[in-house]
């Protein structure tokens, strides 16, 4: 029970166990990229265009218990519910404070949240810059200030994400910064559209010369999105304020690590990745391969939590390879398990929350 239900994909689990002792908070940085509207790239919404609204709906549901902008809970075309169901259930059951951070949503969430002043929706990276010139530097700086302020007096801070299309953009960022990634990132779908992603990444990389990118943040302007660079800034600010940093997400956290590594701001001793077993054991991607190429020795912890025995079909579909991770789900699971929660307790909390959702 608890600690025994978390396993190390790489690195030492003890690092995370010590890191999550004491007080902490989970920030969820969210935003949109038009890359998600490329047909087949993301199933984090009922249609490609609907994926632009998913981060806002995720956050509204996370905070208010239901979406407010549209009267629809984010689901895949197959009806698989957003991973925010897991995050909300676990955070409420095991007292994990949540702070949504808007880095560039398509439409503003109608719940209390932090807003980065330079927030901006990302472009479609195969045909246009990911961000306006200078946006990455501004977002990094603003998120750094937020992380520095937020982490004062805390022992740890976890940072999740919500950005459909994020794994494709993350692959482009990692490749542009010199790391192999295009065939290693995961997908929210059961079948990873690897060839499509590689094609989009190649088109984005072909524009680097056109962008005139000369440094790390200019490269992110060219092929990135608002979320990964904001998480990077927040992580540095929090770490320098004395908090242990948990990157609560899947393979796209590799883009955060790549940005930090190329900026010379990555500290594997005070940073870890926490994710779900659905990412850790995914045969269509390799979070271990990504992290070990960027930050050898950095710990990746995964929650052994399963939904196989759930009475709800929508939740059991996670075991078939759908959704896998997002909105801090893996981080919330790892943190709660390491702090003594049991998998049965968590399953009851998740099923109770999903049942409430279905009941309206």
Curated annotation (Swiss-Prot):
InterPro entries: Nict_dMeBzImd_PRibTrfase, Nict_dMeBzImd_PRibTrfase_arc, Nict_dMeBzImd_PRibTrfase_sf. Gene3D superfamilies: 3.40.50.10210. GO terms for molecular function: nicotinate-nucleotide-dimethylbenzimidazole phosphoribosyltransferase activity. Pfam families: DBI_PRT (PF02277). It comes from the Archaea. HAMAP family: UPF0284. Belongs to the UPF0284 family. PANTHER family: PTHR38811, UPF0284 PROTEIN SLL1500. This is UPF0284 protein APE_2029.1.
């Amino acid at each position: 029970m608890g600690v025994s239900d978390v396993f190390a994909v790489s690195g030492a689990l003890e690092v995370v166990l010590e890191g999550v002792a004491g007080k902490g908070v989970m920030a969820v940085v969210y935003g949109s990229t038009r890359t998600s509207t490329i047909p087949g790239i993301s199933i984090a919404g009922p249609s490609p265009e609907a994926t632009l609204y998913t981060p806002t709906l995720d956050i509204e549901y996370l905070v208010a218990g239901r979406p407010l902008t549209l009267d629809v809970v984010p689901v895949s075309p197959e009806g698989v519910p957003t991973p925010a169901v897991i995050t909300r259930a676990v955070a409420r059951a095991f007292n994990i404070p949540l702070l949504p951070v808007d880095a560039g949503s398509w439409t503003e969430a109608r719940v209390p949240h932090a807003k980065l002043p330079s927030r901006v929706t990302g472009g479609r990276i195969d045909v246009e810059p990911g961000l306006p010139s200078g946006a990455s530097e501004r977002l990094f700086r603003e998120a750094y200030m937020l992380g520095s302020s937020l982490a004062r007096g805390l022992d740890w801070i976890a940072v999740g994400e919500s950005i459909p299309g994020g794994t494709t953009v993350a692959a482009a960022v990692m490749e542009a910064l010199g790391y192999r990634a295009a065939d290693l990132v995961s997908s929210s779908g059961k079948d990873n559209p690897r060839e499509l992603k590689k094609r989009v990444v190649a088109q984005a990389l072909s524009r680097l010369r056109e962008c005139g990118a000369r440094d790390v943040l200019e490269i992110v302007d060219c092929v990135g999105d608002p979320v990964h660079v904001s998480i990077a800034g927040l992580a540095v600010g929090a770490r320098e304020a004395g908090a242990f940093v948990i990157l609560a997400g899947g393979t796209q956290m590799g883009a955060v690590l790549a940005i930090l590594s190329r900026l010379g701001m990555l500290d594997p001793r005070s940073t870890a990745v926490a994710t779900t077993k659905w990412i850790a054991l995914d045969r269509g991607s390799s979070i271990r391969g990504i992290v070990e190429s960027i930050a050898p020795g950095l710990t990746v912890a995964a929650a052994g939590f399963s939904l196989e025995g759930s009475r709800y079909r929508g939740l059991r579909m996670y075991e078939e390879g759908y959704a896998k991770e997002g909105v801090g789900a893996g981080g919330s699971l790892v943190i709660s398990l390491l702090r003594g929660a049991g998998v049965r307790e968590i399953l009851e909390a998740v099923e109770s929350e999903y049942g409430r959702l279905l009941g309206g």
